[in-house]
């Protein structure tokens, strides 16, 4: 996936119908790859403070094999796919993911689809839904180390997940105890 410049990102997020303002504090942008490689981390996250780009890293905005192929074990309607090209103001607040990992936990409703066709692609299909469904921002490991995880597996069934553990903790440490964190999810353009 292409790495985007600060200006490219800002121009794109400001063009969305859901745009209200650029947050004055830290916020995140996720960019969903056109490739959507099955069970692979092929997306990017960008941390910004107001209009300043702080850092970027790799991850996924899509579910892995567990979510796409075994969704019936936790939700018979399908795997959650967060709606892209949307702003989610104050989406997250610092907390713990599953009580085990420092993370950003869902704080406000998110728009999403339920993908249940088992075709190994995370797709925005069916009706748009909205709700509190536990869409967190977290790492792909409970271990704090410098690994880069290759396969998504069960680490995402809708969550936004970083696979570079060291860079993930840079994001979490930088955000610190900020009250809430906004998110803008984009499709690669």
Please name every model-derived segment.
Residues 1-153, 167, 172, 188:
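Cell wall/extracellular polymer interaction/catalysis modules
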Residues 172-189:
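Internal interaction segment
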């Amino acid at each position: 996936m292409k790495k985007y410049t600060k200006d490219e990102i800002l121009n794109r997020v400001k063009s969305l119908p859901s745009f209200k303002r650029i947050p004055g504090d830290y916020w995140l942008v996720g960019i969903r790859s056109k490739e959507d490689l099955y069970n692979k981390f092929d997306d990017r996250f960008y941390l910004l403070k107001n209009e300043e780009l702080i850092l970027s890293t790799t991850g996924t905005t899509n579910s892995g094999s567990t979510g796409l192929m075994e969704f019936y074990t936790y939700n018979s309607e399908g795997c959650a796919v967060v709606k892209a090209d949307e702003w989610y103001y104050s989406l997250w607040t610092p907390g713990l993911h599953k009580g085990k990992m420092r993370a950003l936990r869902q704080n406000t409703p998110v728009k999403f689809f339920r993908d249940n066709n088992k075709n190994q692609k995370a797709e925005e299909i069916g009706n748009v839904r909205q709700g509190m469904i536990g869409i967190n921002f977290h790492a792909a490991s409970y271990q704090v180390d410098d690994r880069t995880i290759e396969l998504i597996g069960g680490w995402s069934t809708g969550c936004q997940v970083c696979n570079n553990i060291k860079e993930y903790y840079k994001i979490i440490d930088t955000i610190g105890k900020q009250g809430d964190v906004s998110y803008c999810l984009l499709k690669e353009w």
